[in-house]
Curated annotation (Swiss-Prot):
The gene is cat. This is Chloramphenicol acetyltransferase. It holds the Pfam family CAT. It comes from Staphylococcus aureus. SMART domains: CAT. The active site is at H189. One of its GO terms (biological process) is response to antibiotic.
Amino acid sequence: MNFNKIDLDNWKRKEIFNHYLNQQTTFSITTEIDISVLYRNIKQEGYKFYPAFIFLVTRVINSNTAFRTGYNSDGELGYWDKLEPLYTIFDGVSKTFSGIWTPVKNDFKEFYDLYLSDVEKYNGSGKLFPKTPIPENAFSLSIIPWTSFTGFNLNINNNSNYLLPIITAGKFINKGNSIYLPLSLQVHHSVCDGYHAGLFMNSIQELSDRPNDWLL
């Protein structure tokens, strides 16, 4: 995947980037997303929720350069043209998990079939990352279906300057006739601000309200 190097000296975020990189400042935001329309459409079509969630999040991540900005393996700052999802799958026997990735296509059904194939192949492997090599342009997301939450944070030793976003969802919450998904976004402040966090959450909600635009 193409990596576009950033000329830091002439970058509009230079001062912000250097300040928050030196401070190693990350932040997380958690919102309840109304997935009522999305969930009902998914069930009507006979799909599983998790791959639809992965596809939706990846689409939003790839819509903004800020979410795709990081360091490549050569230590160069830049942004990828596209990110791929590295997501967790749970092993019901060992009660552990693995992280695998599946390339996202423009067509949801094509991605859905690839997802099912990868899960069948790698679930129960006993390895943390059974599908290798993991591409450089991969971001992390997961879902914790056993509990809901109003806040979530990952404490990372960030000596390697990991700048890509991390997305975590929780157990559905039923409120009347509506279904809500707790959703947490964790970002590095050197590349993402509150503005970008708001864009992310609002875009997730908008696409959840219009699943026919991308699900079918």
